[in-house]
């Protein structure tokens, strides 16, 4: 069953469809903590095993997890990012994709934790400045990004832990900005196109 990863009600509806099929076991790509936990608690009460795919929520205690270690991934991203930014970088941009007041995915959250651990350890004097964009506010992205860059004219290195680095990459293309360096995640089509055009430097 498929669901919209950014909409809790979509996950809940898919979970109900799964429940109606009386499964022997379930493979789950978790959504936010609350809706995932509620579904998994029902599975546990019926002794139905489940595993997590792509994104882990260890406190829910799945039978297994298959996917990337998001904390280590964020730490690794910090290392690669700063190899490019250089030791003299004093301020960098972290773009966050938000949904209903929180980071839109657990992966983003854990990757950021790993990244900040690396930055605190090795580059404590480098300021991480956040640009938070609402998932459902795409019409306002252009003005928000422009205002941010006007306010922080010294920022040239950008990173995001969601799969939508293209939000910045396409902005750079539209506005002919060639002196920015952008790191992101996931080989989605629009990210790949920005990589080819040179407005994304690196994808994990």
Which positions does each model-derived feature cover?
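Structured C-terminal subdomain patch of bacterial secreted/periplasmic proteins
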Residues: 198-204
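Hydrophobic alpha-helical segments within soluble ligand-binding/sensing domains
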Residues: 66-92, 142, 191
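Amphipathic helical "hinge" segments at domain boundaries
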Residues: 1-13
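Short hydrophobic segments within beta-strands
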Residues: 53, 95-97, 159
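Flexible loop/hinge segments that line or gate small-molecule binding clefts
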Residues: 35-72, 188-197
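Conserved acidic residues
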Residues: 24, 63, 156, 201
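An alpha-beta-alpha
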Residues: 78-122
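Hydrophobic alpha-helical
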Residues: 10-18, 25-44, 115, 129-191
